[in-house]
Amino acid sequence: MTQFASPVLHSLLDTDAYKLHMQQAVFHHYYDVQVAAEFRCRGDDLLGIYADAIREQVDAMQHLRLLEDEFQWLSGLPFFKPDYLNWLREFRYNPAQVCVTNDNGKLNIRLTGPWREVIMWEVPLLAVISELVHHYRSPNAGVDQALDALESKLVDFTALTANLDMSRFHLMDFGTRRRFSREVQQAIVKRLQQESWFVGTSNYDLARRLALTPMGTQAHEWFQAHQQISPDLATSQRAALAAWLNEYPDQLGIALTDCITMDAFLRDFGIEFASRYQGLRHDSGDPVAWGEKAIAHYEKLGIDPLTKTLVFSDNLDLPKAVELYRHFASRVQLSFGIGTRLTCDIPQVKPLNIVIKLVECNGKPVAKLSDSPGKTICHDKAFVRALRKAFDLPQVRKAS
């Protein structure tokens, strides 16, 4: 299936902020590290028929580059260094790093190459896949339907929060990867800008063009890669946390907790890390139980939870965010990142549950053992066993 009218992507910055944040850290600390990543469809969608169209879009991405006004805008942000931005100015996507195949209807994608380059593919490639699939499946849906659905949700949201002090409710758009389309995401974000509780977007292109705050720190791959970068598996998570602080000592301090389960994370998250990081991000498992564990951990360390921020970003919608806000608002700072339920929430449109995750670093396996067993990713069962042993995980989690 080919002949999509034009390139889906128009800007190198049409990606999530944490990709550039991680890329700069990799550029400075792990320039020669090699990785492999793979696509997963967590649903039952057979997406292989779109392989040719996806390959065309991958080839078109080699023409994206950082434009001068984009370079100047990034230069004005406090955490990017000139050496990295000058390198990014010369960066081009290399389609040879991407293998796209149709395996009897199943879409297979494997990415290989230097981590500093491969790191950039995940978010825009997922956005491309999502937009292509929805273009063919739902040709009559688009911005109008998405905005109508959002307005309905906002009416319900207003009623749901009528008796609440919403002054500490902060919502972010995390919807780039699985958006219906670029145009839908932009329309949704522009509408949300009218709400006082909307604080920013993870999409750097939208943040620049709409004068919004870009949001994001690091992703699972940062912790996964350290499983092979670090000489000792048992200390690899601490090594990842320390390396991040080395790159960003006073900024971008929200740590992701579920690469090797929340319990294993908290064992590594001692007083120095807990003091220096501004907060934690939830991305799998029961959000209330997770938040209670986080607050209890801070209190045990003698840290006032009200000085820290919990970011919830796992399969959220507005009612779930309000429920969590009601539960936690008096005890800790809160932010909520909503993705698919904002940028691909259209009647009769089935969002894709798709990811691209790291599977190897320097030719050796890495794993994600999240707080939701269905999100576990690793090919190598022996490595999963070693990881469980190193982090004293009590429960067998099936590798997939």
Swiss-Prot record:
Pfam families, alphabetized: NAPRTase, NAPRTase_N
EC number: 6.3.4.21
Modified how: Transiently phosphorylated on a His residue during the reaction cycle. Phosphorylation strongly increases the affinity for substrates and increases the rate of nicotinate D-ribonucleotide production. Dephosphorylation regenerates the low-affinity form of the enzyme, leading to product release.
Known pathway: Cofactor biosynthesis; NAD(+) biosynthesis; nicotinate D-ribonucleotide from nicotinate: step 1/1
Record keywords, A-Z: Ligase, Luminescence, Phosphoprotein, Photoprotein, Pyridine nucleotide biosynthesis
Coiled coil: none
SUPFAM superfamilies reported for this sequence: Nicotinate/Quinolinate PRTase C-terminal domain-like (SSF51690), Nicotinate/Quinolinate PRTase N-terminal domain-like (SSF54675)
CC annotations in GO: cytosol
Catalytic activity field: nicotinate + 5-phospho-alpha-D-ribose 1-diphosphate + ATP + H2O = nicotinate beta-D-ribonucleotide + ADP + phosphate + diphosphate
Record GO biological process: bioluminescence; NAD biosynthetic process via the salvage pathway
Residue positions, PTM Phosphohistidine: H220
Protein origin, superkingdom: Bacteria
GO MF: nicotinate phosphoribosyltransferase activity
Protein function: Catalyzes the synthesis of beta-nicotinate D-ribonucleotide from nicotinate and 5-phospho-D-ribose 1-phosphate at the expense of ATP.
Homology family: Belongs to the NAPRTase family.
Name of this protein: Nicotinate phosphoribosyltransferase
Protein species of origin: Salmonella typhimurium (strain LT2 / SGSC1412 / ATCC 700720)
